[in-house]
Amino acid sequence: MLPSNSSIVGAASPEDWIREISAEMLSEASGLPTEKVKEIFCNEVGFQTPKLDCRAAIFKGDKILLVQENNKTWSLPGGWVDVDQSVKQNTIKEVKEEAGLDVTADRVIAVQDREKHNLPIYAYKVCKIFVQCSVIGGAFQENIETMQSRYFSLDELPPLAEEKNTKEQIEMCFQAYRSKDWETMFD
């Protein structure tokens, strides 16, 4: 029997009912008000699905391009895939925004379940898509997301933004770059 003050009583669909229960459980466990939990996590319609994160692997010789975040760590250019963009379009857009480069998105290196490769674990699921790209123009320009861009060899990697990409993920990108018959890896 549900308590009369539970918001579950008015849930319109099974998805809404599950979302309400989840919000109440997370509220109880975290100490956050239920409305705050809903504001953060319950704004989607239907079943919750993973967010998509794209990362561009751009090479010059035997070096890979990384961008320096405002917190001084480094990552492959990339970010959340916008709802109105394909993975390919978004990867190209993110590289332009973060590294100032015009690129072509040439092949998918890997599709990974973020939880299996990156920390910390998020409260929502994320699929990471690594895309090998080629530069066709442009140059780094000052922006609000990144401080600089630079190419690094595998043995001289700087401190990484490991919530975005790990050394193992960058090694995987190098392996794909060096292989003519790379097959997309996926979890």
Please provide the spans of the model-predicted regions.
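N-terminal secretory targeting and juxtamembrane "stalk" segments of secreted and cell-surface proteins
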Residues: 1-13
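Acidic, metal-coordinating catalytic segment for phosphate/diphosphate chemistry
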Residues: 13-55
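Residues that form generic nucleotide/phosphate-binding pockets
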Residues: 25, 40, 169-176
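N-terminal strand-loop-strand
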Residues: 38-76, 103, 107
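Unchanged
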Residues: 81-105, 113-169, 185-186
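Acidic/histidine-enriched, glycine/proline-rich intrinsically disordered or flexible terminal extensions
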Residues: 173-187
